[in-house]
Amino acid sequence: MKDLTDKQQAVLAFITAIIKERGFPPTIREIGDEFGITAKGAYDHLKAIEKKGYLKTAKNQSRAIELIRQSPMESLPVQATSIPVIGQVAAGLPIFAEENIESYIPVPDEMAKGNVPMYALRVQGDSMIEVGINDGDIAIIEKRDIARNGEIVVALIEDEATLKVYYKEQDQIRLEARNPKYKPIKTKKATVMGKLIGLYRIY
């Protein structure tokens, strides 16, 4: 049996969680809705997972999914939501555009607040090390376009996303690092793309 991609792992974890929760698998449409893809896209993921020996599907039956092998993420909490890991946040594109998404990861439902969208962003650099955010960490972000002073946010400046502490001043926005090597960024053109609510670290 071959290894699954990150997205295939997330799909398999979702199927496993639904079966445990209600006793039967999700439909292809439900899988598509969960991951923001078409029914055909969901079906293609199922067939790829089936080829790797993790499940069986039956033709012409929307719920005919049988698990053969447990998901590699089975040790994670069952009540979990898959969120996209955004490779880049670019101006002019929806943040969840397919071309922005590099993989998916599960997060506990306790992190979620109702239906507020979330995404993850890979941290680059050491500008936030004094608050325990290191290079390579995965920041869990609640999508929003407003922030309060002192919150850690993802801000888009031109075509570059940065994770910084937000302060709104009279005629500008100040974005502060938490590393004395870096000076504050002062700008009138920053766009808030979300607020930090959690952190994943891979050892």
From Swiss-Prot:
SUPFAM superfamilies with a match to the protein in the record? LexA/Signal peptidase (SSF51306), Winged helix' DNA-binding domain (SSF46785)
Q: Which residues bind DNA?
A: 28-47
Listed A to Z, the keywords are: Autocatalytic cleavage, DNA damage, DNA repair, DNA replication, DNA-binding, Hydrolase, Repressor, SOS response, Transcription, Transcription regulation
Q: Name one GO biological process term.
A: DNA repair
Q: Which residues form the active site?
A: 127 (for autocatalytic cleavage activity), 164 (for autocatalytic cleavage activity)
Q: Which InterPro entries match?
A: LexA, LexA-like, LexA/Signal_pep-like_sf, LexA_DNA-bd_dom, LexA_repressor, Peptidase_S24_LexA, Peptidase_S24_S26A/B/C, WH-like_DNA-bd_sf
The family note in this entry says: Belongs to the peptidase S24 family.
Q: What is this protein called?
A: LexA repressor
Protein source organism: Leptospira interrogans serogroup Icterohaemorrhagiae serovar Lai (strain 56601)
